[in-house]
């Protein structure tokens, strides 16, 4: 359904723009330039057409950026809008609120959502992990007898 709003052919300038943004994104992440992530997540191929289906997209994105998010974008075909934030390193629960930006950004997105969305949304505050993808369950299980894999899968 949401693929139907995308163009079957794209202008060369749009393709060049998005390819350049991917390079910018990789560079920003590899060089830990969080403030440049905003430019690395700019898009002209899938977000503008999907904004017609998700009229809240740009109000949520603008609210997150205005509140201090480093980047914000439509995740896949949506409806998830993801904001990248930062704060002090370490245990979130032992830090002073002023060290963290995610709550202010979440509040701004909630307020924008209440104003522009017909349905309520949820905010999930997460953090990146270095582990990557892992197996949660295997059937049949890999673990047998006294040999155990992480998570006992």
Region roles according to the model:
Residues 1-6, 10-12:
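Short, acidic (Asp/Glu-rich) active-site segment that either coordinates a divalent metal cofactor
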Residues 18-23, 29-153:
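Glycine-rich, charge-dense phosphate/pyrophosphate-binding loop(s)
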